[in-house]
Amino acid sequence: MTKEEKTLKEYIFTSESVTEGHPDKMADQISDAILDYIIEHDPSAHVACETLVSNGFCVIAGELKTTAYAPMQEIVRRVVQEIGYTDATYGFDYRSAAVLNGIGEQSPDITQGVTLLDGEIGAGDQGLMFGYACRETDVLMPLPIYLAHLLTRRLAEVRKEGIIPYLRPDGKAQISVKYIGDKPVSVEAVVVSTQHAPEVSQEKIREDVIRDVIRAVIPAELMSEKTLFHINPTGKFVIGGPQGDAGLTGRKIIVDTYGGSCPHGGGAFSGKDPTKVDRSAAYACRHVAKNLVAAGVCDRVTIQIAYAIGISAPVSIMIDTHNTAIVEEKKIESCVKELFDLTPKGIIKSLDLLRPIYRKTAVYGHFGREEEGFTWELTNRVEDIKKYLKIN
């Protein structure tokens, strides 16, 4: 440790992720699969789709304004099958689960506020949204949530590819990272809870998970002999998925975003079309934040924007660079207002959000993803920002 590091604050920060077979994430994926189907057939649709999965059944509720017909039963069963609930012995399977449809029509009171006479789109609700970016990883995300998502994605991979064939779909991971100042330096603890077949010993599960999951994705230089591994710390984890816990859309909002590294406005994403600023404005905030950091304006930034229902322009914009900016924050705020159209219509157009891209966002985080379709992760405004702020 350098002399400078000794004077900096030391702390441990923890984030978690869950697998695609976690009941809350099952609900998110079902809601977004329904959204994808509807938006593919009717891009102007308004969708608010909520899902409940529990012991042997699934309930779909919410409001639609669309000309499309969505085969709800077929969509639900396909998602559950693709996740991996294919056997009745898992306690929930795509063939036998009951599917109840309680979808209704969107209130005309909401419709009139969203569809404005001048062609603009009013915010679908009031609310506040946050975006964040930092230099802890190549994708400009905090390290703890980034690593937690790598673990849960790997749990699904080793299950589906037969590397650890006795695993079942439900699972969680948690990472505790030590910081000195604002710099992550080591992984202090890893927690993995994974559903499994009943005949497998905990000793074998521990050995396989440490070797094929943890060490496969966490860089060796971040771990040491002092790193703690807690694998299924309660003992066996046979009963899982909707049989073990009910799942609801929108209950993993910190997993979906930054793992607790920045504030959250409280609005969930899944099942909502992009006129809902809970979703689209949070994506826009991330896009702005990532481009500011990528442009070298700051090393870390938190952005908040807020809306009133039926009003297109944000009622407020706040930028906090955590004392890492090379220009005044007021100038950065002016830059953002000038270069980024943060009306719902502007966000939808600039990020190309009227596409069936949402189910894949519903697991392993909405941010820090480099797959096709995650337009809010593009650093395509860097040169515009540099030019406006007159920085190299």
UniProtKB/Swiss-Prot annotation:
Its cofactor is Mg(2+); K(+). The keyword Nucleotide-binding applies. K(+) binds at E50. Binds 2 divalent ions per subunit. Residues 106-116 are annotated as: Flexible loop. GO terms for cellular component: cytoplasm. InterPro entries: ADOMET_SYNTHASE_CS, S-AdoMet_synt_C, S-AdoMet_synt_central, S-AdoMet_synt_N, S-AdoMet_synthetase, S-AdoMet_synthetase_sfam. Pathway: Amino-acid biosynthesis; S-adenosyl-L-methionine biosynthesis; S-adenosyl-L-methionine from L-methionine: step 1/1. NCBIfam families: metK. This is S-adenosylmethionine synthase. It comes from Sulfurimonas denitrificans (strain ATCC 33889 / DSM 1251). The gene is metK.
